[in-house]
Structures are given as C-alpha cells and as structure tokens.
Swiss-Prot record:
It is found in: Cytoplasm. Belongs to the lyase 1 family. Argininosuccinate lyase subfamily. GO terms for molecular function: argininosuccinate lyase activity. It is an enzyme of class 4 (lyase). Its EC number is 4.3.2.1. This is Argininosuccinate lyase. It holds the Pfam family ASL_C2. Keywords: Amino-acid biosynthesis, Arginine biosynthesis, Cytoplasm, Lyase. Coiled coil: none annotated. InterPro entries: Arg_succ_lyase_C (IPR029419), Argininosuccinate_lyase (IPR009049), Fumarase/histidase_N (IPR024083), Fumarate_lyase_CS (IPR020557), Fumarate_lyase_fam (IPR000362), Fumarate_lyase_N (IPR022761), L-Aspartase-like (IPR008948). GO terms for biological process: arginine biosynthetic process via ornithine; L-arginine biosynthetic process. It comes from the Bacteria. It comes from Roseobacter denitrificans (strain ATCC 33942 / OCh 114) (Erythrobacter sp. (strain OCh 114)). GO terms for cellular component: cytosol.
Length: 466
C-alpha cells in the first residue's frame, strides 16, 4: 500500500464492496465538489421534492419525509451562509449534502436515496441549473434589446454609411443599423425560449437507468420542480446532455452576435471613425499614454466569445463517443457550461451598459455617409426608372461615372451635368435629386428598408412584442 492510499474506503455512500480506499490521486481526479457545489440550491430543491414524494406515496414514513425536508433547508442555510464543510472525500455536492443531512437528522437521512440514483439526481440538478441560466439569459437579452431600441428611436433618421466588406456601400440610418441587432438578438431570445421549453422534462425518478421498482410518483416531483412532465424514457433521461449542448449552442450564436457588435464598436469609437463615443464607465486608459481611452469592454466581449465557442466544442467532444447510459466522462460537462454561462451573462451586461451609455456622433455619421460614392446604386436605379435602361447597362454607366469622379478627385454629386452627359447623353438635371444621402435613405421604403418611416414601424413592432 502506497503513502497515497487509504486503508479503508472513505466514502460511506458506496464503499461497501471495496476492501481498500481510493488513492489520493483517485480522490482528486474523481472529486467534482470544487465546481458542482454551484448546484447546491438545485440539488437541495430536487432532494426536497423527492423526499416529499417518498412521504406522500408511503415509501417512507411521513415523519421521516418531513425531517428530511426540514433538514435539507438547514443544509441550504449553512451553504448560503458560507460555513458548510465541503469535503473532497465525499466527491460531489450530492454526497456532501446527504452526509451533512445525516449529521443533522440521523438515520432517516439514509432513506432519502430510496428510488433514486446519482445518475438521475445529477441530471435533475444540472437541468434545473441550466434552466435558471436560460431565464437569466432571457432577462439579459431583453435588457439589451430595449437599450438598442432606445438608440434606434433616438437616431431613426440619422444618416450613416452602410458597409459591405467594410467598404462604403449605401447610406442607411443609425436606427436601421441598431434594429439589425435587435432582430439578431431577438432570434437569440427565441432560441433561449425554445431551448427552455424543450429541456423542461424531469429526469428525477429515472434512477440509474432502468427506473425503479418502488411505487414513486414522477409526475408529482416533476410538478414540484416546475417541469412540464417527467422524461418519457429513463435510459434517455440519464444518458444525454443535449440540453446542456443546446444551451451552449444557443449561447455561442448569441456570443457571435455580441462579438460582431463589439467589433463595430471598437472600430466606430476610434479616432479614424468617430462614429460613437463610449462612456468612461465602459472604457479604460493607458499606463503610459495619457490621451488614450480604450474600448476594453468591447474588446473583452470579443475575446470571451472564444471561451464560449470552446465550451460548446469541448462538451461535444466529451459526449460524442459515450455508450448509454452514464459514464464518468459526463462529470466533465458542468465546468464548460458554468464558464460559458458566466461569460455570456457578463458579456450581455457589458454590452447593455455600453449601448445604454454610448453617444452617436451624428455629424461624423452623416459626413461618412456621403463619402465613397454611397449613392451609386441610387444613380443606377434612376437610370433604370427614368431612362428605361436595363439594369446591367445602368450598372455599367454608373461604374463609368464613378471612375470619372475618382479621376476628378470628387464625389458623384460634384460632377457637372456636362460630365455626366459625356458618359450617357440621356442624363438630365433631375439626376442630382437622387445623389443626396438624405433622399437616398428616404427612398428605401420597401418593407424592412432603411427609410425612417420603416425604421419607426420596426421599433413600434418590437415595443409591442416586448
């Protein structure tokens, strides 16, 4: 026996068939209490529901069930007060809670695990925890969407450049750009709600994998824990973590949207763009350059997204080769989800704060909107509507006019009518009406377009939805 071995199993929950205790290294790799103690509230909620059901069905004496329920509340209060004696030797939150319950109420604590396994217990705890996080994500997304709506409403008719390839494309409005993110985060909100609805089935009572011979009432515990129904197949209930993967997938898509917006805020707040000014509350300075005001919140959001993507991939890799039902590999599911949830909630809160506090520079936006031949498409459309040119010919004529303006180092509205007629003789003076950026955005009245009237309709629709 090595120095790291224990002479007898230190775990009284499952050690009956073992002659020797686990090696200290085995205890270290096997223990999850360092992270799964975050599920203490969920574990105790599940155990209290199970205890109440055991008493109601007569599987245990009602007095024992009551003692278990009250004792579990005492355990919860100790954990919340920060003076609970967590033990690595007891491996996880489930055994730590049960061991402490036995110290408090004695022999009845040993009846709590009747008709239950750690397999369905941990699946229940984890589902409850993920469900709580989905609710928190929903609240965070709603706050961000409302902040974006406020920005969109304030600048519904402020002209700015729209980009493709980060090159000037067409004029749009600030409100239209903000509403694009409202739509993206709105779909994230829908995915969060869908994921919550799909996962809301209770694993409790599935036991190890095959169910139990005790006359338990799974519908009772499901209802007590706020689930819509018990999971229909006990083997599936303890085997899969697709609810956690769906959370991570949903979080990854939302994080991607946050990262794209963060990237734009980094660019827009630079001295080269000056589209927005971020508040001091969400910026930092430099230790050597006194003039610096850095968009660190946006940059950190952009970086944290990688951790969320990584968590999704990591859990996929854990689950991809596991036969049914439970394997110890699945203990590695929680840290990924915990970290992703923490970083997503922090990123949502930081983005909401930045959006709420940032100030758009209307003058810089308008000036940039008129550069880069942004109304070239309006010119091509005018050639089609007024002169009857096929669009491909209009596209070619407009390209030639852009080349002429570039050669003259001017923008399209600065060309003379004579310049334009040199490219196409049919052009009339009315063409200048479509070359202004204000007229350009006002003309985009198709459903979902950038015209202020359409932007305000979009805002009103979202206000009503929320």
């Amino acid at each position: 026996m090595t120095d790291t071995q224990n002479p007898k199993s230190s775990n009284q929950m499952w050690g009956g068939r073992f002659a020797d205790g686990p090696d200290a290294i085995m205890e270290a790799i096997n223990a999850s209490i360092g992270f799964d103690k975050r599920m203490a509230a969920q574990d105790i909620a599940g155990s209290r529901a199970h205890a109440a059901m055991l008493g109601a069905t007569g599987i245990v004496e009602p007095s024992d069930a009551q003692a278990m329920g009250e004792g579990l509340l005492t355990v919860l209060s100790e954990i919340e007060a920060g003076n609970f004696p967590f033990s690595t030797a007891l491996e996880d939150i489930h055994m730590n809670v049960e061991a402490r319950l036995k110290e408090i109420i004695g022999e009845p604590a040993g009846r709590l695990h009747t008709g239950r396994s750690r397999n369905d217990q941990v699946a229940t705890d984890f589902k409850l925890w993920v469900r709580d996080q989905l609710d928190a994500c929903e609240a965070g997304l709603l706050a961000l969407i409302r902040a974006l709506l406020d920005q969109a409403e304030a600048g519904a008719d402020w002209v700015m450049p729209g980009f493709t390839h980060l090159q000037t494309a067409q004029p749009v409005t600030w409100g239209h750009h903000m509403m694009a993110y409202v739509e993206m985060f709105g779909r994230d909100l829908s995915r969060v709600r869908d994921a919550r609805a799909r996962m809301n089935e209770s694993p409790l009572g599935a036991a190890a994998l095959a169910g139990t011979s005790f006359p338990i009432d799974r519908h009772m515990t499901a209802q007590a824990l706020g689930f819509d129904r018990p999971a229909a197949n006990s083997l599936d209930a303890v085997s899969d973590r697709d609810f956690a993967l769906e959370f991570l997938s949903t979080a990854s898509i939302c994080a991607m949207h946050l990262s794209r917006f963060a990237e734009e805020l980094v660019i827009w707040s630079s001295a080269q763009f000056r589209f927005v000014a971020l508040s001091d509350r969400f910026s930092t300075g430099s230790s050597i350059m006194p003039q610096k005001k850095n968009p660190d919140a946006a940059e950190l959001i952009r970086a944290k997204v990688g951790r969320i993507f990584g968590a999704n991939t990591a859990l996929m890799m854990v689950m991809k080769g596991l036969p049914l039902a439970y394997s110890k590999d699945m203990q590695e599911d929680k840290e990924q989800v915990f970290d992703a949830a923490d970083n997503l909630m922090l990123a949502l809160a930081a983005m909401t704060g930045m959006v709420s506090d940032m100030t758009a520079n209307r003058e810089s936006l308008a000036q940039a909107a008129g550069s880069g031949f942004s109304t070239a498409t309006d010119l091509a459309d005018w050639l089609v509507r007024v002169l009857g040119l096929p669009f491909r010919e209009a596209h070619h004529v407009t390209g030639a006019l852009v080349a002429l303006a570039e050669a003259k180092h001017c923008d399209l509205p600065d060309l003379t009518l004579e310049d334009m007629r040199g490219v196409h003789a049919g052009i009339t003076g009315d063409v200048f009406d479509v070359l202004g950026v204000e007229n350009s955005v006002q003309s985009r009245i198709s459903y979902g377009g950038t015209a202020p009237v359409r932007v305000r309709e979009q805002i009103a629709r979202w206000r009503a939805l929320l």
